[in-house]
Structures are given as C-alpha cells and as structure tokens.
Amino acid sequence: MSITPYSTYHLIKSQDLNHHGTLYAGRCADWFVESGFIAACSLAKSEHIVCLKIHGLLFSKPAHLGDILCFESKVVLAGRTSLISHVQVIKDGQPMLDGFITFIHVDLKGKPQPHNIIITATRPEDLDLQKKARQLRP
C-alpha cells in the first residue's frame, strides 16, 4: 500500500486553553493521537487498533485562542502487528509539532494479531519518515 495522508482540523476554543492562555498540551495530545488513529484505521478496522506508544511531542511554537490547527497523519511503517503513524501539526502553514505513534493490531480479545499490511514509501520525505520510524522499534 502506498502512504496516504489524512488531514483533520481543530479550532482552538477557550476550553482548550491552559492557565497561560495557550493551547493545553493535553488537549493537543488528544487530537494528535486521534489523528494518528484515523490514519491507522484507514488500513484496519478500528476495533482492532490500540495505541501502544506516543514517541515524543515537541512543541516548536504555541497556539492561541482562535487558531486553526491542521493535523496531517499517515501510516509510514508496518511491522507484523504494528502500524506507526507520523503526525505533523501545522499552524498558519508552518509546522508547530510532529511525532510518531505506534499502534498495535489486536484480535477481539486484545491480543496482538498480524495484519498483513505492507507499506510502500516512494517519496523522499516518506522514505525519511520510514527510516526514523524504524529507529523507534525495539
């Protein structure tokens, strides 16, 4: 399968702010995982996908009330039972955060189950993301 990007958008409202008046990191982490999950569920049924690990969130700039954030996600690497999504958050056309999330494909009892998905990267940026994702695996 080729790498397909998915975009979701969020408007920052007053209930999304922290005590500094900027986007609460926990709210952003929630949206971040949701975006990666959507990409993973494009390849497998949602009832078979669980989150294993978020691989770092580094905020390069703050987000404020009224900002609209674009979460661009794509599955860049597939293991035997794992799917690794890359998520980039964009504000005003500029990246403000990115990271990886590992999801596991499970059976209905929650045990890891092979998914038989093969991801093929062709674009240089996707090949680079695949290389970084491989370094995250134990």
Question: How should each PLM-predicted stretch be described?
Answer:
Residues V33-E34:
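A eukaryote-biased signal for short, well-structured alpha-helical docking elements
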Residues Y6, H64-L65, V76-P138:
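HotDog/MaoC-like acyl-thioester-processing domains
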Residues M1-A25, K132-P138:
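Catalytic strand-loop segment that frames the active site of acyl-thioester-processing enzymes
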Residues Y9-K13, L58, T102:
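Generic structural detector for well-ordered beta-strands
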Residues I3, F37-E72, V76-I84, Q94-G99:
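Hydrophobic beta-strand-centered segment that forms part of the acyl-chain substrate-binding groove
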